[in-house]
Amino acid sequence: MGEVTAEEVEKFLDSNIGFAKQYYNLHYRAKLISDLLGAKEAAVDFSNYHSPSSMEESEIIFDLLRDFQENLQTEKCIFNVMKKLCFLLQADRMSLFMYRTRNGIAELATRLFNVHKDAVLEDCLVMPDQEIVFPLDMGIVGHVAHSKKIANVPNTEEDEHFCDFVDILTEYKTKNILASPIMNGKDVVAIIMAVNKVDGSHFTKRDEEILLKYLNFANLIMKVYHLSYLHNCETRRGQILLWSGSKVFEELTDIERQFHKALYTVRAFLNCDRYSVGLLDMTKQKEFFDVWPVLMGEVPPYSGPRTPDGREINFYKVIDYILHGKEDIKVIPNPPPDHWALVSGLPAYVAQNGLICNIMNAPAEDFFAFQKEPLDESGWMIKNVLSMPIVNKKEEIVGVATFYNRKDGKPFDEMDETLMESLTQFLGWSVLNPDTYESMNKLENRKDIFQDIVKYHVKCDNEEIQKILKTREVYGKEPWECEEEELAEILQAELPDADKYEINKFHFSDLPLTELELVKCGIQMYYELKVVDKFHIPQEALVRFMYSLSKGYRKITYHNWRHGFNVGQTMFSLLVTGKLKRYFTDLEALAMVTAAFCHDIDHRGTNNLYQMKSQNPLAKLHGSSILERHHLEFGKTLLRDESLNIFQNLNRRQHEHAIHMMDIAIIATDLALYFKKRTMFQKIVDQSKTYESEQEWTQYMMLEQTRKEIVMAMMMTACDLSAITKPWEVQSQVALLVAAEFWEQGDLERTVLQQNPIPMMDRNKADELPKLQVGFIDFVCTFVYKEFSRFHEEITPMLDGITNNRKEWKALADEYDAKMKVQEEKKQKQQSAKSAAAGNQPGGNPSPGGATTSKSCCIQ
């Protein structure tokens, strides 16, 4: 068989298309595609402009896909697309303008410039300091970015949008232009522009189609780059907020340390060579001694810039963070005006206007005087700058953060502005923490000062203590110089006899005694309870404490020291005479009597409701039991003073228990809580009757802390209301004092609150006092003393006292009712007589049928 020629094979394949296709797919298709994808360069001749064949165009597309797959550098991928487009469009050169927003203004900046079919990337890549920037209202590229549509300009000289300043800079003549936006959704990302058609007078419709077709590659590249960049920025932003947040909440006391910790921690995510933070002086008003020299003409007035809220711009501290080379941090207190971060005037400008300033080419900047030479031995120079204010929640500028030289050499862009603004905004808001801490610290210091002032006026001084502890008279020395035995000897002579003054009796009256004598009686009660020696109470501290308590009560009508003492005396009587002491330890008895003496200290003569209505600070401080909690805190404040602390020698557990008992006892005097606890107390009384022996019940109660606390709470109520159980001669006088204080509150409600008081506090209804007293006894008081007399029969005298006083008040109430009834009857008779007299007047008789008669005429 002879050799087969190429012509014969070609003829055979043309005649058998199906076989040719099958053979090709089986033997060559995979290899061909593999060769195409594996080829490093497309087999297309780019040396001369010519119309590519379909095969060449396919190879170009494969080349672009391969390049996009292998190359992660955005500029290089776009550069390759533009080189291919130069050949396909037969354009002399092409350029890429990136869309960005700087200082809130959109603009286009050259990124790839003068790309042609034989260009090298390094020659076409525009460095940040060599950028050509177009605003959107300038040039054809600005018009394309604004309209978001392709533009084909056949003749630039006839186009109104064309601007020749680039031609002047480059000494190049632009004749025709084909430009198109690269979009990401509805947003412009970049503008790609081809200039000067090589083989024609202008770009054709065919060129537009080619540009749009290959623009899909550029669009995809830019979209991937843009999404990757956004992802990177958001990741950095999240890390910055996370780490700065963690450091902000570590440091709540000082703004400088707070800023430093946050800014130093996030330094790796800021993507810049240096950043500087200037902290502004927050003083709004100068001291008079600083103003006088200005007013006297000795010092010129300040004429520099001011913050939007009127403060002089004075950076009291600058912190420099140097991240290039060897990391360093420099803190400059009271920086001079020529400090490298301030000398340009940019931080002051930002502080004055509150604007974000993004400067892409600092050496070429005319408005700000940036240093154009290296700042230090490292040769570092300022290239681009981003500066923004740090604003707190009050919209006051507290500082300025300035970032220098983005690490990749590009100028700071919109995403950098957003990222840095998030950081500075967070730092500004976090200023609230140290501000709040400082305010709280000042309030705490003021509170301590005021407490010191109060204690100075309330505490028993060295002259007053000599009225009881007469150490100067007896020993010729001060109390603290005496031994406890010497003080005990003086007190034994000075303190009253318990039996003589009847301080353990339920019918005790304070009226014949002076306030100083009441203080002495109070001291004697501690000795009667035998707690002074047992708990090693310093006798000087005991005397000072009781005397200070008497001074702590205000000089008001009823809730004064006499009332405070009476409550303490009744507590003492319930424990001793009422035999309730057997349920409580000596420590608890000490705490209960002390709480009773303290229970109304610093009372203002008005009740809790008035504190709320008048919006008294006490009402804002304490949510419930307002005055009771204030009395408790006042008493604790006195006890915290070493010279007054009668609990100073208790161990920790004893001290905590004593304070706990005082807390319950004083809060329990709130009558609003009385109705909640009396049912529980009644159950305890009922339970006590189920025990056969008193000893078993006592042993049970001593171990039941909750029941003991309920009994103590009811004891405090019984003590607080004990004036109602006193002999009539005493009770009638005390009731008038209580009523007078109520009427004073009623007057305040009328004058201050512009409200009508309740009848109990209305002095215009003073005659109704007996009736109100009967109601108060029946509704509030009787239950307490009836249950206590049932609980312990030794307390029956208190029930007898209230029963007798009710009779007296009831008699007065009946007398008042009878008097009012007589007055009402008399008034009715007078009205009847007046009506009868009016009926006998002419024209006064009613007309027939009930019609009203005329006063001026009558019908005959």
Curated annotation (Swiss-Prot):
Could you list this entry's UniProt keywords, alphabetically sorted.
Acetylation, Cell membrane, Cell projection, cGMP, Disease variant, Hydrolase, Lipoprotein, Membrane, Metal-binding, Methylation, Prenylation, Repeat, Retinitis pigmentosa, Sensory transduction, Vision
Localization terms from the record = Cell membrane; Cell projection, Cilium, Photoreceptor outer segment
Query: Which residues of this UniProt protein bind a divalent metal cation 2?
Result: D600
Q: Which residues form the PDEase domain?
A: 483-816
Check the record and name the Gene3D superfamilies matching this protein. Answer: 3'5'-cyclic nucleotide phosphodiesterase, catalytic domain, 3.30.450.40
Name the job this protein performs. Rod-specific cGMP phosphodiesterase that catalyzes the hydrolysis of 3',5'-cyclic GMP. This protein participates in processes of transmission and amplification of the visual signal.
The identity of this protein, by name, is Rod cGMP-specific 3',5'-cyclic phosphodiesterase subunit alpha
UniProt source species: Homo sapiens
What lineage does the source organism belong to?
A: Eukaryota, Metazoa, Chordata, Craniata, Vertebrata
